């Protein structure tokens, strides 16, 4: 290799312990996310294209790892889905919508937050403020310790936490499944009608038919659902989102293959043997939400039209167009400068901003505190 050649010629400036370099790389990755490293053996072991030969590279952003050789140049056909669009308002759990009453008091942030929850769900209410001198008698009369308290007719529902839980937005997995199948179908059509700059790119795309479906706005989704990004609940929702997308993409690709046949290099691939991505990662997936065993049998019988399906890309520019946070990343900061090929923009966490406005806490002091920290 060139490295060994330079080493033999004593062209190096100095010698550094390899382990020290490795630890520096790991420190940098954990603190900054760079340098980008891919592990060749792991990439090939977990690829549905490993029957084609050894995969030697990825694209710049590392969301796709595809086979290339002297006769074909890998291409991928990408689209991202805005996850925030699948957050839906729950069905209203109250029985007496014409008789919702809340008890509040002055200088109570929890009271403001409860009113905000009701406002977001278009629920009208009557507010009664409890004066300081009446607070002890109020607690005894209603058998509560704090305000706010919400009544649905004559039924005590509870305080802010209870109401927030009842009105918590839900994620529409069925709609995501439907949209992912549409995107899969559309990207598959792009392969056939696309313009190819070289013969080798067309050869690769027609032979392997890879597509890459990614996401944007995962952080927005968690914000809309009032789920902390680092929480166990967020991990569950994240897993269910990608399980839904992977199942939908596989199912649609299989349905297309029933009509048009599997992609040319399907035979010998892991999918042709009923081995899917989670199998190559030694992950067990239950059939609670989707019947994976049935889908595997259908894929072995009919094939799939596309060798690759999901590819969570950075969405640095497209997420700005739709007003979402990038891909599956957490919010970088509540206020920051974003630079894209289109220019430089000041980005603010719009969900936090709206919450602060709704509860009356958006003011100059708050803004300066956000900028400071």
Q: Which ranges hold each PLM region?
A:
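Non-catalytic, surface beta->alpha helical segment in thiol-disulfide oxidoreductase systems
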Residues: 152-169
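Long, C-terminal-biased catalytic regions of enzyme "large/alpha" subunits
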Residues: 1-97, 120, 168-373
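Alpha-helical elements of the RecA-like P-loop NTPase motor core of helicases
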Residues: 112, 116, 136, 165
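Thioredoxin-like thiol-disulfide oxidoreductase module
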Residues: 127-145, 163
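Local sequence-structure signature of Cys/Sec-based thiol-disulfide redox active-site neighborhoods
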Residues: 33, 96-128
């Amino acid at each position: 290799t060139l490295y060994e050649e330079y080493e033999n010629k004593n062209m190096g400036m100095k010698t550094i312990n390899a382990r020290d370099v490795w630890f520096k790389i790991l420190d940098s990755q954990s603190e900054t996310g760079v340098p980008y490293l891919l592990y060749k053996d792991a990439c090939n072991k977990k690829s549905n294209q490993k029957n084609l030969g050894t995969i030697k590279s990825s694209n710049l952003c590392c969301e796709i790892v595809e086979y290339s050789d002297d006769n074909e140049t890998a291409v991928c056909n990408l689209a991202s889905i805005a996850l925030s669009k699948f957050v839906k308002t729950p069905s209203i759990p109250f029985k007496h919508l014409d008789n919702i009453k809340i008890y509040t008091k002055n200088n109570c942030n929890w009271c403001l937050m409860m009113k905000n929850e009701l406002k977001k769900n278009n629920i009208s209410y009557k507010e009664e403020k409890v004066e300081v001198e009446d607070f002890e008698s109020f607690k005894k009369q209603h058998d509560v310790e704090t305000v706010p308290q919400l009544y649905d007719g004559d039924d005590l529902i509870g305080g802010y936490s209870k109401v927030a839980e009842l009105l918590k937005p839900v994620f529409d997995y069925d709609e995501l499944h439907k949209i992912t199948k549409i995107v899969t179908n559309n990207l598959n059509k792009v392969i056939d009608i696309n313009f190819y700059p070289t013969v080798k790119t067309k050869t690769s795309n027609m032979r392997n038919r890879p597509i890459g479906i990614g996401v944007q706005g995962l952080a927005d989704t968690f914000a809309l659902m009032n789920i902390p990004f680092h929480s166990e609940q967020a991990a569950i929702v994240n897993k269910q989102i990608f399980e839904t997308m992977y199942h939908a993409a596989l199912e649609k690709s299989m349905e297309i293959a029933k009509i048009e046949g599997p992609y040319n290099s399907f035979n010998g691939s892991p999918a042709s043997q009923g081995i899917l991505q989670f199998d190559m990662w030694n992950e067990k997936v239950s059939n609670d939400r989707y019947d994976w065993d049935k889908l595997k049998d259908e894929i072995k019988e009919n094939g799939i039209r596309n060798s690759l399906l999901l590819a969570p890309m950075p969405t640095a520019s497209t997420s700005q167009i739709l007003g979402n946070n990038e891909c599956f990343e957490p919010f970088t900061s509540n206020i920051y400068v974003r630079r894209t090929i289109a220019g430089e923009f000041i980005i603010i966490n719009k969900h936090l901003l709206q919450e602060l406005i709704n509860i009356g806490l958006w003011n100059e002091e708050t803004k300066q505190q956000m900028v400071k920290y």
